């Protein structure tokens, strides 16, 4: 294969990856914990954007349970974002596994 052609394809893939990253950063991924008592929203960069608590879960006598529910909801929302990013990345790269971890 022609080296210049390969470099051109790589440059094209870089552009598509940048576009995909920008699009993903605009998406929101939500997850529930405790049967919907805690909701966490993260963006496509896996940054926490919102925590929503049902009033019934706020019990001063059981803060540990609330903390656990928040951790579960955030982790699940981040997993959804990571899974979506992986799917989009597979589309951009044509299924080629990249030998490095992307910073998002």
From Swiss-Prot:
Cellular compartments annotated: Cytoplasm, Nucleoid
Gene Ontology, cellular component aspect: bacterial nucleoid; cytosol
Keyword Magnesium assigned: no
InterPro entries, A to Z: YbaB-like_sf, YbaB/EbfC
One Gene Ontology term of the molecular function aspect: DNA binding
Entry keyword Electron transport: no
Pfam assignment, any one: YbaB_DNA_bd
Primary location group: cytoplasm
This protein's UniProt keywords: Cytoplasm, DNA-binding
Protein family (similarity comment): Belongs to the YbaB/EbfC family.
Classification via PANTHER family: NUCLEOID-ASSOCIATED PROTEIN YBAB
Reported function: Binds to DNA and alters its conformation. May be involved in regulation of gene expression, nucleoid organization and DNA protection.
The protein's assembly and partners: Homodimer.
Protein name in the entry: Nucleoid-associated protein GAU_1113
